[in-house]
């Protein structure tokens, strides 16, 4: 077979290293530099001619820099005659801009999809897209993995006496119900009203949480305002404990302070984005082995269906 290579950008090299270690191959070499005016310059340091290549690069903050770096690396690999170029994007930035939510606004997620394809990506592997329909913005294969596989095993290992799943808002009900069904648990809903971007107001609880160990489920944690306020309300309604599960730890603004000083007992996240700092309340689970297994199967033309269960 042609052989494959794993490259990583500068956004999360540790994640790329984990993938390479799982696969038993070294990370391939690429040099990322910046000119004095800030322009990104990339040089692929080894031959990729005829090879299948996988680029690991979450488009987290600084989002524009990391996205541009990914696009330039794709272009460099295309011009170096790689056989296929697979963009491994653990966290897909701009996914919240998936539709026209107001007059005269862009659909930036579609623009990013177009840019990736135009640059030369032949496949995208990502996790827990904020809006699943973004897969339809692409004309190339998109594997949207579920972080719930890793979170499910963690929840089981805690042996909580009286667990129940909660959605932090109406929009996340489908995601939370899927997770609840996987574990055979009941579901409650936190009904909230969002006053403006990144500011959330929790209203009431739909369901009974008295004496329950509540597990809040969401795809990303941005300012942590939703989760912090939800935890307060849940405990005021009699919840024994509140754990939050969020695939992508964006953690902007005062997120760390809200987690550390708030009512949440634990915040469990995946390592799709590197953390800015550690906290005794934050538990990080690695999803790198899951991505690595998908890469292995894609290269060997094996089905990845079982990894979505």
Swiss-Prot record:
EC number: 2.7.6.1
Binding site for ATP: 37-39, 96-97
Cell compartment(s), UniProt: Cytoplasm
Transit peptide among keywords: no
Keywords: ATP-binding, Cytoplasm, Kinase, Magnesium, Metal-binding, Nucleotide biosynthesis, Nucleotide-binding, Transferase
Function: Involved in the biosynthesis of the central metabolite phospho-alpha-D-ribosyl-1-pyrophosphate (PRPP) via the transfer of pyrophosphoryl group from ATP to 1-hydroxyl of ribose-5-phosphate (Rib-5-P).
This protein's GO CC annotations: cytoplasm; ribose phosphate diphosphokinase complex
Bound cofactor: record note: Binds 2 Mg(2+) ions per subunit.
Gene3D superfamilies: 3.40.50.2020
Subunit note: Homohexamer.
UniProt xrefs under SUPFAM superfamilies: PRTase-like
MF terms in GO: ATP binding; kinase activity; magnesium ion binding; ribose phosphate diphosphokinase activity
GO BP terms in the entry: 5-phosphoribose 1-diphosphate biosynthetic process; purine nucleotide biosynthetic process; ribonucleoside monophosphate biosynthetic process
Protein name, entry field: Ribose-phosphate pyrophosphokinase
Matches recorded under Pfam families: Pribosyl_synth (PF14572), Pribosyltran_N (PF13793)
Pathway field: Metabolic intermediate biosynthesis; 5-phospho-alpha-D-ribose 1-diphosphate biosynthesis; 5-phospho-alpha-D-ribose 1-diphosphate from D-ribose 5-phosphate (route I): step 1/1
SMART domains hit by this protein: Pribosyltran_N
């Amino acid at each position: 077979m042609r052989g494959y290579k794993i490259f990583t950008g500068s956004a999360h090299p540790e994640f790329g290293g984990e993938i390479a270690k799982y696969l038993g191959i070294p990370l391939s070499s690429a040099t990322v530099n910046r000119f004095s005016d800030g322009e990104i310059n990339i040089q692929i340091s080894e031959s990729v001619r005829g090879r299948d290549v996988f680029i690991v690069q979450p488009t987290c903050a600084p989002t524009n820099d990391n996205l541009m770096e990914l696009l330039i690396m794709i272009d460099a690999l295309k011009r170096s005659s790689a056989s296929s170029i697979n963009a491994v994007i653990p966290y897909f930035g701009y996914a919240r801009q998936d539709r026209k939510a107001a007059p005269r606004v862009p659909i930036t997620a579609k623009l990013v999809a177009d840019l990736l394809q135009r640059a030369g990506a032949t496949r995208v592997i990502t996790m827990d897209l904020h809006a699943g329909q973004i897969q339809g913005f692409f004309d190339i294969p998109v594997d949207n993995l579920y972080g719930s596989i890793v979170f499910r095993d963690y929840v089981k290992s805690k042996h909580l006496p009286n667990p129940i799943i909660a959605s932090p808002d109406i929009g996340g009900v489908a995601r939370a119900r899927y997770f609840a069904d996987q574990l055979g648990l009941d579901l409650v809903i936190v009904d909230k009203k969002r006053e403006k971007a990144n500011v959330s107001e929790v209203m009431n609880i739909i369901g009974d949480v008295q004496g329950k160990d509540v597990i809040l489920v969401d795809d990303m944690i941005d300012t942590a305002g939703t989760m912090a306020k939800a935890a307060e309300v849940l405990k005021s309604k009699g919840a024994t404990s509140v754990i939050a599960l969020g695939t992508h730890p964006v953690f902007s603004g005062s997120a760390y302070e809200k987690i550390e000083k708030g009512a949440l007992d634990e915040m469990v996240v995946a390592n799709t984005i590197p953390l800015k700092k550690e906290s005794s309340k934050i538990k990080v689970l690695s999803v790198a082995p899951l991505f690595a297994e998908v890469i292995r199967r894609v290269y060997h033309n094996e089905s990845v269906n079982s990894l979505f269960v």
